[in-house]
From Swiss-Prot:
Protein name: Cytochrome b
Provenance organism: Ursus thibetanus
Keyword Transport: yes
Any one Pfam family match given in the protein's UniProt record, by short name: Cytochrome_B
Membrane topology label: Multi-pass membrane protein
């Protein structure tokens, strides 16, 4: 009798994705982040669901309902902090996952890569709207500043912003609709992640060497299930440490003050995972130019496959490109630091230089390095 996991219509899908899937024999820990992102997403959906049971999306009671969750709901504080810090873990895994794709040339699997970019935008939108929900000072002013960027769009800008707000400022209507979107988007992300996997399994995974691995495949289970389990354990350990020892480490103290439209906080800034994009936005004096740079800072990922000039897929054997890649990482860390600083000398000029360097590395230096390395390999 044939094993049920290979014949049952539903079990067959799971079997072909998680058990009998042929995987390259040499994929490193950098390939763990896909499963970790899946775990983060499930964790966020579950903690979010329990938070939604006690949260009220009304401007007058939203802040109090979050305080009520932390004080009066059984283990409400741990659910709330797991959700807030789970988002940080989600973004750490996302950045690692995208960085791995850039380093090892995984962007050449174009369908998977493009769905990944859509996923990145969707997760960023979800995180932004989630940050508005506690209705603290930074929630309110963050929502005001970021939605206001759309007013830079010529002709329809102002109307568009007021349409999103549901009035003439960020108010009750804005909070209610943000809650509705924040609730539905994770399920859309889940569906997109399934499509992401579907496209990946059409071609199979890339591997660190960048050489096709069809001649050397191993079953996903038990080799990579146990490897993913170790990664999951380490992620849970990191998250638990953060939640139980310093839950407010990555948050903003201003968000413990209820939203007040009459008092602007001295420094409006988003959560840490948006600071690099926020720094790029601020480094351009023109409003529309800043918005375009902000969008393009993420959208640039879509043209990376077109700029691939090297004969080799990954950067494993390309020292010039490796140097540029790590320079890019250092540049992004610099931008993240600048995004959290006030707009004054010397931070303005550092931010502008870091922004120029970011686009220069990706659009100019990396393609040139690929060509140089092709020529060097002829020697």
């Amino acid at each position: 009798m044939t094993n049920i996991r290979k014949t049952h219509p539903l079990a067959k899908i799971i079997n072909n994705s998680l058990i009998d899937l042929p995987a390259p024999s040499n994929i490193s820990a950098w390939w763990n982040f896909g499963s970790l992102l899946g775990m983060c997403l499930i964790l966020q959906i579950l903690t979010g669901l329990f938070l939604a049971m006690h949260y009220t999306s009304d401007a007058t009671t939203a802040f109090s309902s979050v305080a009520h969750i932390c004080r009066d709901v059984h283990y409400g504080w741990i659910i709330r902090y797991m959700h807030a810090n789970g988002a940080s873990m989600f973004f750490i895994c996302l950045f690692m996952h995208v960085g791995r794709g850039l380093y090892y040339g995984s962007y050449l699997l174009s369908e998977t890569w493009n769905i990944g970019i859509i996923l990145l935008f969707t997760v960023m939108a979800t995180a932004f709207m989630g940050y508005v929900l506690p209705w603290g000072q930074m929630s309110f002013w963050g929502a005001t500043v970021i939605t206001n960027l759309l007013s830079a769009i010529p002709y329809i800008g102002t109307d568009l912003v007021e349409w999103i707000w549901g009035g003439f400022s960020v108010d009750k209507a804005t909070l209610t609709r943000f809650f509705a979107f924040h609730f539905i988007l994770p399920f859309i992300i889940l569906a997109l992640a399934a499509v992401h996997l579907l496209f990946l399994h059409e071609t199979g995974s890339n591997n660190p060497s960048g050489i096709p691995s069809d001649s050397d495949k191993i079953p996903f289970h038990p080799y990579y299930t146990i490897k993913d389990a170790l990664g999951a354990l380490l992620l849970i350990l990191a998250l638990a440490t953060l939640v139980l020892f310093s839950p407010d480490l990555l948050g903003d103290p201003d968000n413990y003050t209820p939203a007040n439209p009459l008092s602007t906080p001295p420094h409006i800034k988003p959560e840490w995972y948006f600071l690099f994009a926020y720094a790029i936005l601020r480094s351009i004096p023109n409003k529309l130019g800043g918005v375009l740079a902000l969008i393009f800072s993420i959208l640039i990922l879509a043209i990376i496959p077109l700029l691939h000039t090297s004969k080799q897929r990954g950067m494993m054997f390309r020292p010039l490109s490796q140097c540029l890649f790590w320079l890019l990482v250092a540049d992004l860390l610099t931008l993240t630091w600048i995004g959290g600083q006030p707009v004054e000398h010397p931070f303005i000029i550092i931010g502008q230089l870091a922004s120029i360097l970011y686009f220069t590395i990706l659009l100019v230096l990396m393609p040139i390095a690929g060509i140089i390395e092709n020529n060097l390999s002829k020697w």
